[in-house]
């Protein structure tokens, strides 16, 4: 029951009225309308009064107030009924529908739009792009269908001139994934004729007033609605709707939905074709019928993408097949005009049906598998024309009012009749409430052989000329005794009925007088086959696809098509079956006045609607009845977790006893009744309380299930990981063994090979053994080197180590490293035999004095002294010192440098013998080896390798630089040494430069 509204606004729910009477009902309805409260409840039925003004009650903030709330928690609103239908669909996995009923102008179309808006707003919380696309297309489809299916009438500026039922499909999470639209009985006669004060369909005026000038020129259209006969008949060219703005909105909506540019252009070409058809004039020349404004024929040919002569022939002639003979029968003036109007109506109807079909192709659910995606549930929204009583009521109004009778019958069946019958069947104490059952009126229209539709179809099938008057006579003969049918012949004193024209039906909503003029013609819905062939043969593929029957041969015999009445009756029966299969929610719309005033509440006008809608009976049934009923197994299935006696399964004698125990435990036994197979719950508050308790328990159950399931998953994951680890370990062992076996096989006899297995190709190791392979290769290489070195003498071993050190350090940095010759080391003893004895004597004295173990290297050098002068000296390097000697003074030692004071050496990348010894005290020694025998021998590689090998044996690091120029420090001053090649130079020599020194060497 509704809450949160003070008594100044009246009773929000009519069930709460103090006295259930028509006077009380009307007084409450009027009070709420005057206070701006346009929505009220009758239990779970929403009563909506058209406010005839914009109201600020549909924004995002209002949507949030109703999202997920129960009906009685918030004031009455369309959003509440939409949320209730959505929750029922989501909670119970059951299809639901919202039936919006009321007469023309009561606000049904607007109500359906707000319901769609609400459903779109509350779904897709995760903002999935595909769901957003579907929602957007569903909303935009309303805009397109209104443009082509709605029109201004004397009662309503935006009256639906067709019936629309939309199914919205939802996935198991409750997000929209598609939809489907069914359309019913477009009032196509409005294309060529409108009553005084009315307009044709919005689309025509939107095109004329809103299309760009260039587009109008291409369509041969003027920006003046009065220039076109078909749309100026009603004399009402203005509307509260902005046609120019709506044109752009509709075009944009069609693009969003997915119409191609070519399809949109074809739509506007068809609209232009209809406008031009209305201006087509026929004349006669004797017995020959002519087109007076023949220029329009070429325009029509252009718009229809067909030949001009074919258009003219279809307008003036009809092809008749008699056996094998085919003749062209010329139309009379009347037949040509009839054919033109029939073509205009048929083209527009086909266009509208094609638009609906195109929208369905785009928005329908595709590739949905319930086994994979869960059950596909549906919410249906019915927005169909309301009950109509015009000054002149024809075939269309008859069908529309029959439709409303069927919907009223459904309401009676589900809300009034079935509910009371169910109480009696279940043994619930109940006082019967009388109501008017309109089944007798439905039978009057649709009963086989006797109903009005049956009589009309029979008249249309008779051979010979059958007139509307003959049809009326047949009705009078068959329905003379029917309480809800009369005519002037049956009621001679009733002067409101015309002889041989009118009949009256007493509908549930009141008496309606119908004119039979046009009934036969509209029921036959005749369109010459010539027009169908003309349009099928169009070069426009979209237009061609609309007329598939045009491909039939002229001589082909076809079955008689179903009449318009039969088609409509079948569609209504199908619609009612569809609605009856779903859980219905009702919106009953009331029109407060006929002048569209936001202030006027016409008491008698509203009272009549309340009576024929059966709202008072609805209040009585709802007040005496129960809001909810469920079978015992279904109730237990949903709520058994609330009670310890029923969770997880009960051990009581029956489900009924289990439900009783559950409700007693919750304290609700005063608000329920127990039937034979169902439990009946009186108020929504009890259901809401049960849902709250269930939601709380579901959280706990879910947490428990999550804990158990996560534990199960963890154990499964652990077992899989452990099994995988065992397999991985076993596989690794296998791969390691396989690899090692292969290595052993390949290197089995390497000791006996000449190259000790150097040519053997290593097997590819598994990834896990790559580092192992590197270590194994290193071990092999060390073994291979050892096998080579093992036979050598200690002296040769030392030489080999020095050469390896040179190669590792200088490979690729100097051209000649001297690796191919034997390294002597002590060259002063070898290169100068005449002075060798003096050198040996001095060397022995130094060994005794400084206690060095061996001579690493000796050579004659050219050096720079501290006065920046070049001089010849001898260089002796032992394992402890670096000695400078004067060869001219019997190799007298000049100065020694402790070897531990040497930090590095620098050499150039050329063939010169320049070497710079870097020291810790920045007093570097710059020398150039000379006096080599043979001449041109390179000893730099030997010097560097010998020093590297010695430093490595002492676990010290020697920095070796191969650069040019060489940077060094001389007597604490930074300088550079540059090597230059000179052709005239006979011996290497140093000269002073601005930045340091230049070593000039002989060159080619």
Curated annotation (Swiss-Prot):
Protein name per its UniProtKB record: Unconventional myosin-Id
Binding partners and assembly: Interacts (via the two IQ motifs) with calmodulin. Interacts with F-actin.
GO molecular function: actin filament binding; ATP binding; calmodulin binding; microfilament motor activity
GO annotation, cellular component aspect: actin cytoskeleton; cell cortex; cytoplasm; dendrite; early endosome; extracellular region; microvillus; myosin complex
Subcellular location: Cytoplasm; Perikaryon; Cell projection, Dendrite; Early endosome
A Gene Ontology BP annotation from the UniProt entry: endocytosis
Major subcellular location class: cytoplasm
Domain of life: Eukaryota
Annotated keywords: Actin-binding, ATP-binding, Calmodulin-binding, Cell projection, Cytoplasm, Developmental protein, Endosome, Motor protein, Myosin, Nucleotide-binding, Protein transport, Repeat, Transport
Transmembrane segments: none
């Amino acid at each position: 029951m509704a809450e949160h509204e003070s008594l100044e606004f009246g009773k929000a729910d009519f069930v709460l009225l103090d006295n259930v009477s028509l006077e009380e009902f009307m007084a409450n309805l009027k009070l709420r309308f005057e206070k701006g409260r346009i929505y009220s409840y009758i239990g779970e039925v929403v009563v909506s009064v058209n406010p005839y003004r914009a109201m600020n009650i549909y924004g995002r903030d209002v949507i949030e107030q109703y999202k997920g709330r129960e009906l009685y928690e918030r004031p009455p609103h369309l959003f509440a009924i939409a949320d209730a239908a959505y929750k029922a669909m989501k909670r119970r996995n059951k299809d639901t529908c919202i039936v919006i009923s009321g007469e023309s102008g009561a606000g049904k179309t607007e109500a359906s739009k707000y319901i769609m808006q609400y459903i779109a707003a509350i779904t897709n919380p995760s903002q999935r792009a595909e769901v957003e696309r579907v929602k957007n297309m569903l909303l935009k489809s309303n805009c397109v269908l209104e443009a082509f299916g709605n029109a201004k009438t004397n009662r309503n500026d935006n009256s639906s001139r067709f019936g629309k039922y939309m199914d919205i499909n939802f996935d198991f999470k409750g997000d929209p994934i598609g939809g489907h639209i069914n359309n019913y009985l477009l009032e196509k006669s409005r294309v060529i004729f409108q009553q005084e004060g009315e307009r044709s369909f919005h689309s025509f005026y939107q095109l004329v007033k809103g299309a760009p000038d260039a587009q109008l020129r291409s369509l041969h259209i003027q920006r003046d609605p009065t220039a076109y006969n078909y749309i100026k008949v009603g004399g009402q060219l203005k509307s509260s709707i902005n046609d120019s703005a709506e044109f752009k909105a509709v075009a944009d909506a069609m693009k969003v939905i997915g119409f191609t540019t070519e399809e949109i252009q074809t739509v506007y070409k068809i609209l232009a074709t209809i406008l031009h058809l209305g201006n087509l004039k026929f004349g006669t020349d004797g017995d020959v019928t002519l087109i007076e404004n023949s220029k329009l024929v070429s325009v029509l040919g252009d718009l229809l993408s067909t030949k001009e002569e074919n258009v003219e022939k279809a307008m003036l002639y009809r092809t008749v097949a008699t056996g094998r003979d085919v003749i062209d029968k010329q139309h009379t003036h009347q037949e040509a005009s009839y054919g033109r109007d029939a073509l205009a109506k048929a083209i527009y109807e086909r266009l509208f049906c094609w638009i609906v079909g195109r929208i369905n192709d785009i928005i329908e659910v595709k590739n949905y598998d319930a086994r994979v995606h869960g059950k596909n549930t549906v919410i249906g929204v019915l927005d169909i024309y309301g009950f109509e009583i015009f000054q002149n009521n024809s075939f269309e109004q008859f069908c529309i009012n029959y439709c409303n009778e069927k919907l009223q019958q459904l309401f009676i069946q589900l809300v009034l009749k079935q509910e009371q019958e169910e109480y009696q069947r279940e043994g619930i104490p109940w006082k019967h409430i009388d109501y008017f059952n309109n089944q007798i009126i439905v039978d009057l229209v649709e009963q086989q052989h006797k109903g009005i539709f049956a009589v009309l179809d029979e008249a249309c099938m008779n051979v010979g000329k059958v007139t509307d008057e003959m049809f009326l006579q047949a009705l009078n003969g068959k329905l003379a005794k029917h309480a809800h049918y009369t005519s002037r012949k049956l009621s001679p004193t009733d002067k409101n009925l015309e002889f041989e024209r009118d009949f009256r039906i007493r509908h549930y909503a009141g008496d309606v007088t119908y004119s039979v003029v046009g009934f036969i013609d509209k029921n036959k819905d005749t369109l010459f086959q010539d027009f169908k062939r003309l349009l099928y043969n169009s070069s426009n593929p979209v237009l061609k696809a609309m007329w598939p029957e045009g491909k039939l041969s002229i001589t082909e015999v076809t079955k008689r098509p179903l009449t318009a009445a039969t088609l409509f009756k079948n569609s209504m029966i199908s619609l009612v079956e569809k609605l009856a299969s779903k859980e219905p929610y009702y919106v009953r719309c009331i029109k407060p006045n006929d002048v569209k005033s936001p202030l006027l509440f016409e008491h008698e006008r509203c009272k009549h609607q309340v009576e024929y809608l059966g709202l008072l009976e609805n209040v009585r049934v709802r007040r005496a009845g129960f809001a909810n009923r469920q079978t015992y197994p279904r109730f237990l299935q949903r709520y058994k977790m609330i009670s310890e006696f029923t969770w997880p399964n009960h051990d009581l004698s029956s489900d009924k006893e289990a439900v009783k125990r559950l409700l007693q435990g919750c304290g609700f036994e005063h608000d329920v009744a127990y039937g034979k197979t169902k439990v009946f719950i009186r108020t929504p508050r009890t259901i809401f309380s049960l849902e709250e308790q269930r939601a709380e328990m579901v959280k706990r159950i879910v947490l428990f299930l999550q804990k158990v399931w996560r534990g199960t998953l963890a154990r499964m994951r652990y077992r899989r990981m452990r099994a995988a680890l065992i397999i991985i370990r076993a596989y690794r062992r296998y791969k390691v063994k396989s690899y090692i076996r292969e290595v052993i096989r390949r290197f089995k006899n390497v000791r006996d090979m000449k190259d000790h297995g150097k040519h053997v190709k290593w097997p590819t190791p598994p990834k896990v053994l790559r580092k192992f392979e590197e270590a194994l290769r290193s071990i092999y290489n060390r073994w291979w080197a050892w096998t080579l070195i093992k036979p050598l003498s200690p002296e040769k071993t030392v030489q080999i180590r020095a050469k390896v050190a040179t190669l590792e350090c200088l490979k690729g940095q100097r051209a000649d490293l001297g690796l191919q010759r034997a390294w002597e080391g002590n060259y002063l003893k070898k290169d100068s035999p005449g002075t060798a004895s003096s050198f040996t004597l001095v060397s022995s004295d130094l060994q005794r004095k400084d206690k060095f173990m061996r001579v690493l290297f000796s050579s004659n050098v050219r050096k720079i002294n501290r006065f920046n002068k070049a001089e010849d000296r001898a260089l002796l390097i032992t394992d402890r010192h670096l000695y400078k000697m004067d060869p001219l003074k019997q190799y007298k030692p000049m100065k020694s440098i402790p070897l531990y004071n040497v930090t590095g050496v620098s050499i150039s990348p050329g063939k010169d013998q320049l070497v710079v010894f870097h020291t810790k005290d920045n007093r570097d020694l710059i020398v150039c080896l000379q006096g080599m025998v043979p001449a041109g021998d390179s000893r730099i590689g030997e010097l560097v390798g010998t020093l590297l090998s010695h430093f490595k044996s002492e676990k010290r690091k020697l920095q070796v630089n191969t650069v040019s120029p060489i940077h060094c420090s001389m007597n604490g001053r930074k300088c550079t040494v540059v090597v230059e090649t000179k052709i005239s130079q006979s011996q290497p020599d140093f000269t002073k430069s601005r930045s340091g020194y230049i070593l000039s060497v002989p060159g080619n």
